[in-house]
A protein has these predicted regions:
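Conserved SAM/SAH-binding loop
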Residues: 98-106
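Hydrophobic/small residue at the entry helix of a nucleotide-binding pocket
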Residues: 33
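Conserved N-terminal Rossmann-fold NAD(P)-binding element of oxidoreductases
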Residues: 27-29, 52
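Glycine-rich phosphate/adenylate-binding loop
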Residues: 2, 21, 110-114, 121-126, ...
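N-terminal charged helix/coil linker that caps or initiates catalytic domains
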Residues: 1-25
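Glycine-rich phosphate-binding loop and adjoining beta1-alpha1-beta2 segment
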Residues: 46, 51-89
Length: 239
Protein backbone atom coordinates (compact mmCIF):
# COMPACT_ATOMS: atom_id res chain seq x y z
CA UNK A 1 0.00 0.00 0.00
CA UNK A 2 1.27 3.45 -0.93
CA UNK A 3 2.20 5.73 2.00
CA UNK A 4 4.41 8.78 2.60
CA UNK A 5 7.42 6.72 3.78
CA UNK A 6 7.16 3.93 1.20
CA UNK A 7 10.44 4.80 -0.56
CA UNK A 8 12.29 4.67 2.77
CA UNK A 9 10.64 1.36 3.66
CA UNK A 10 11.92 -0.05 0.36
CA UNK A 11 15.48 0.51 1.62
CA UNK A 12 15.22 -0.01 5.37
CA UNK A 13 12.32 -2.43 5.70
CA UNK A 14 9.13 -2.24 7.73
CA UNK A 15 10.75 -3.38 10.99
CA UNK A 16 13.15 -0.42 10.88
CA UNK A 17 10.35 2.05 10.18
CA UNK A 18 8.29 0.57 12.99
CA UNK A 19 11.26 1.04 15.32
CA UNK A 20 11.71 4.68 14.22
CA UNK A 21 8.02 5.41 14.70
CA UNK A 22 8.42 4.43 18.37
CA UNK A 23 11.54 6.56 18.96
CA UNK A 24 11.75 9.94 20.68
CA UNK A 25 14.60 12.22 19.60
CA UNK A 26 15.38 15.65 21.04
CA UNK A 27 17.01 18.34 18.91
CA UNK A 28 18.59 21.12 20.97
CA UNK A 29 19.19 24.16 18.75
CA UNK A 30 17.27 24.75 15.51
CA UNK A 31 19.69 26.89 13.54
CA UNK A 32 21.58 26.02 10.38
CA UNK A 33 22.46 22.51 11.59
CA UNK A 34 19.54 21.66 13.85
CA UNK A 35 16.81 22.72 11.43
CA UNK A 36 18.06 20.25 8.81
CA UNK A 37 18.60 17.51 11.39
CA UNK A 38 14.99 17.86 12.56
CA UNK A 39 13.77 17.83 8.96
CA UNK A 40 15.50 14.54 8.15
CA UNK A 41 14.33 12.96 11.39
CA UNK A 42 10.72 13.89 10.59
CA UNK A 43 11.07 12.59 7.03
CA UNK A 44 12.55 9.34 8.40
CA UNK A 45 9.33 8.66 10.37
CA UNK A 46 10.81 9.26 13.79
CA UNK A 47 7.61 9.18 15.81
CA UNK A 48 8.30 11.81 18.46
CA UNK A 49 10.47 14.93 18.45
CA UNK A 50 11.26 17.46 21.15
CA UNK A 51 12.49 20.65 19.46
CA UNK A 52 14.32 23.18 21.63
CA UNK A 53 15.28 26.73 20.70
CA UNK A 54 14.67 30.04 22.46
CA UNK A 55 15.23 32.27 19.43
CA UNK A 56 12.94 33.85 16.88
CA UNK A 57 13.81 33.82 13.20
CA UNK A 58 15.68 36.85 11.89
CA UNK A 59 16.50 38.21 8.45
CA UNK A 60 20.13 37.03 8.64
CA UNK A 61 18.96 33.44 9.25
CA UNK A 62 17.53 33.20 5.74
CA UNK A 63 20.82 32.27 4.08
CA UNK A 64 21.17 28.94 5.94
CA UNK A 65 18.26 28.01 8.22
CA UNK A 66 15.49 25.82 6.84
CA UNK A 67 12.64 27.57 8.63
CA UNK A 68 13.80 31.10 7.84
CA UNK A 69 11.66 32.69 5.15
CA UNK A 70 10.46 36.22 4.53
CA UNK A 71 7.09 35.04 5.83
CA UNK A 72 8.45 33.53 9.08
CA UNK A 73 10.79 36.28 10.31
CA UNK A 74 9.90 37.08 13.91
CA UNK A 75 8.32 33.69 14.66
CA UNK A 76 9.79 31.26 17.19
CA UNK A 77 12.00 28.66 15.53
CA UNK A 78 10.63 25.82 17.64
CA UNK A 79 7.03 26.62 16.72
CA UNK A 80 7.78 26.92 12.99
CA UNK A 81 9.75 23.67 13.16
CA UNK A 82 6.89 21.85 14.88
CA UNK A 83 4.39 23.11 12.32
CA UNK A 84 6.58 21.91 9.46
CA UNK A 85 7.16 18.48 11.03
CA UNK A 86 3.41 17.99 11.46
CA UNK A 87 2.92 18.93 7.82
CA UNK A 88 5.44 16.25 6.83
CA UNK A 89 3.88 13.60 9.06
CA UNK A 90 0.46 14.29 10.64
CA UNK A 91 1.00 11.34 12.99
CA UNK A 92 4.20 12.70 14.53
CA UNK A 93 4.23 13.82 18.16
CA UNK A 94 6.10 17.12 18.42
CA UNK A 95 6.97 19.12 21.53
CA UNK A 96 8.27 22.62 20.69
CA UNK A 97 10.11 24.26 23.59
CA UNK A 98 10.83 27.97 23.14
CA UNK A 99 13.42 28.02 25.90
CA UNK A 100 17.16 28.05 26.56
CA UNK A 101 18.82 24.88 27.79
CA UNK A 102 21.21 25.54 30.67
CA UNK A 103 22.32 23.89 33.90
CA UNK A 104 19.89 25.90 36.02
CA UNK A 105 16.85 24.65 34.10
CA UNK A 106 18.03 21.27 32.84
CA UNK A 107 15.33 19.26 34.62
CA UNK A 108 12.66 21.09 32.62
CA UNK A 109 13.99 19.41 29.48
CA UNK A 110 14.21 15.82 30.69
CA UNK A 111 10.56 15.24 31.58
CA UNK A 112 10.25 12.68 28.78
CA UNK A 113 12.43 9.72 27.84
CA UNK A 114 14.71 10.35 24.88
CA UNK A 115 16.14 7.63 22.68
CA UNK A 116 18.71 10.04 21.22
CA UNK A 117 19.79 13.67 21.53
CA UNK A 118 21.02 15.92 18.72
CA UNK A 119 23.16 18.67 20.25
CA UNK A 120 23.18 21.70 17.96
CA UNK A 121 23.70 24.26 20.73
CA UNK A 122 26.10 27.16 20.15
CA UNK A 123 27.06 28.08 23.72
CA UNK A 124 29.89 25.87 24.99
CA UNK A 125 28.79 25.90 28.65
CA UNK A 126 25.28 24.73 27.74
CA UNK A 127 26.66 22.23 25.25
CA UNK A 128 28.95 20.69 27.87
CA UNK A 129 26.18 20.39 30.44
CA UNK A 130 23.84 18.72 27.94
CA UNK A 131 26.53 16.20 26.96
CA UNK A 132 27.29 15.41 30.59
CA UNK A 133 23.61 15.02 31.44
CA UNK A 134 23.05 12.72 28.47
CA UNK A 135 25.92 10.52 29.62
CA UNK A 136 24.68 10.36 33.20
CA UNK A 137 21.18 9.46 32.02
CA UNK A 138 22.36 6.86 29.51
CA UNK A 139 21.03 8.73 26.47
CA UNK A 140 23.03 8.50 23.22
CA UNK A 141 24.05 11.95 21.97
CA UNK A 142 25.74 13.39 18.90
CA UNK A 143 27.13 16.94 18.91
CA UNK A 144 27.64 19.40 16.09
CA UNK A 145 30.93 21.27 16.18
CA UNK A 146 31.78 24.41 14.23
CA UNK A 147 30.29 24.86 10.75
CA UNK A 148 30.78 28.62 10.46
CA UNK A 149 33.54 30.13 8.32
CA UNK A 150 33.75 26.94 6.22
CA UNK A 151 33.14 26.34 2.52
CA UNK A 152 33.67 22.63 1.69
CA UNK A 153 30.82 20.33 2.78
CA UNK A 154 32.68 17.24 1.56
CA UNK A 155 35.10 17.56 4.50
CA UNK A 156 32.35 17.12 7.08
CA UNK A 157 32.42 13.78 8.88
CA UNK A 158 30.88 11.85 11.75
CA UNK A 159 33.62 10.73 14.12
CA UNK A 160 34.69 10.53 17.75
CA UNK A 161 35.84 13.79 19.31
CA UNK A 162 39.17 12.15 20.18
CA UNK A 163 39.89 12.01 16.43
CA UNK A 164 39.19 15.68 15.70
CA UNK A 165 41.76 18.28 14.68
CA UNK A 166 42.04 21.86 13.38
CA UNK A 167 38.53 22.92 14.55
CA UNK A 168 38.89 25.46 17.41
CA UNK A 169 35.60 24.40 19.00
CA UNK A 170 36.70 20.76 18.94
CA UNK A 171 39.90 21.71 20.77
CA UNK A 172 37.97 23.53 23.50
CA UNK A 173 35.45 20.70 23.79
CA UNK A 174 38.14 18.02 24.08
CA UNK A 175 39.79 19.89 26.95
CA UNK A 176 36.57 20.66 28.79
CA UNK A 177 35.20 17.14 28.36
CA UNK A 178 38.45 15.61 29.66
CA UNK A 179 38.09 17.76 32.78
CA UNK A 180 34.66 16.16 33.23
CA UNK A 181 35.99 12.65 32.71
CA UNK A 182 34.44 12.31 29.24
CA UNK A 183 36.84 10.89 26.65
CA UNK A 184 34.50 9.91 23.86
CA UNK A 185 31.67 11.71 22.09
CA UNK A 186 30.14 11.23 18.66
CA UNK A 187 30.43 14.48 16.71
CA UNK A 188 29.87 15.99 13.29
CA UNK A 189 32.82 18.19 12.45
CA UNK A 190 35.08 19.44 9.68
CA UNK A 191 38.89 19.72 9.69
CA UNK A 192 38.65 22.54 7.14
CA UNK A 193 40.60 25.65 8.25
CA UNK A 194 38.46 28.73 8.77
CA UNK A 195 37.95 30.90 5.71
CA UNK A 196 38.92 34.56 5.83
CA UNK A 197 35.83 36.66 6.49
CA UNK A 198 34.76 40.26 6.94
CA UNK A 199 32.75 41.47 9.93
CA UNK A 200 29.66 43.18 8.52
CA UNK A 201 27.40 42.58 11.54
CA UNK A 202 27.75 43.54 15.20
CA UNK A 203 28.26 40.48 17.44
CA UNK A 204 25.67 39.60 20.07
CA UNK A 205 26.57 40.09 23.76
CA UNK A 206 29.23 37.62 24.88
CA UNK A 207 30.61 37.04 21.38
CA UNK A 208 33.74 38.55 19.91
CA UNK A 209 32.61 38.09 16.31
CA UNK A 210 29.77 36.79 14.16
CA UNK A 211 30.55 33.50 12.38
CA UNK A 212 30.16 33.76 8.61
CA UNK A 213 28.23 31.00 6.88
CA UNK A 214 27.13 29.58 3.55
CA UNK A 215 23.94 27.57 2.97
CA UNK A 216 25.54 24.25 2.09
CA UNK A 217 27.83 23.51 5.07
CA UNK A 218 25.49 23.71 8.11
CA UNK A 219 22.73 21.94 6.17
CA UNK A 220 25.06 19.08 5.24
CA UNK A 221 26.15 18.78 8.87
CA UNK A 222 22.52 18.51 9.96
CA UNK A 223 21.80 15.82 7.39
CA UNK A 224 24.87 13.84 8.45
CA UNK A 225 23.82 14.15 12.08
CA UNK A 226 20.29 12.89 11.42
CA UNK A 227 21.63 10.07 9.26
CA UNK A 228 23.88 8.89 12.10
CA UNK A 229 20.99 9.04 14.57
CA UNK A 230 18.62 7.08 12.33
CA UNK A 231 21.18 4.42 11.45
CA UNK A 232 22.12 3.95 15.10
CA UNK A 233 18.48 3.69 16.14
CA UNK A 234 17.71 0.99 13.59
CA UNK A 235 20.92 -1.03 13.94
CA UNK A 236 19.96 -4.72 13.63
CA UNK A 237 16.42 -3.81 12.56
CA UNK A 238 16.87 -3.46 8.78
CA UNK A 239 15.71 -6.31 6.56
Amino acid sequence: MEHRFLRTEMVLGDRALDRLSRCHVAVFGLGGVGSYAAEILARSEVGELTLVDQDTLSLTNINRQLYALSSTVGEYKAEVAARRCRDINPDIRVHPLCATYDAAHREDFFAGKFDYIADCIDLVTCKLDLIQQAGERGIPIISALGTGNKLDPTLLQVTDISRTSVCPLARVMRRELRDRGIRHLQVVYSPEPAAETRQLEAPSPGRRSVPASVPWVPSTAGILMASAIVRNLIANESE
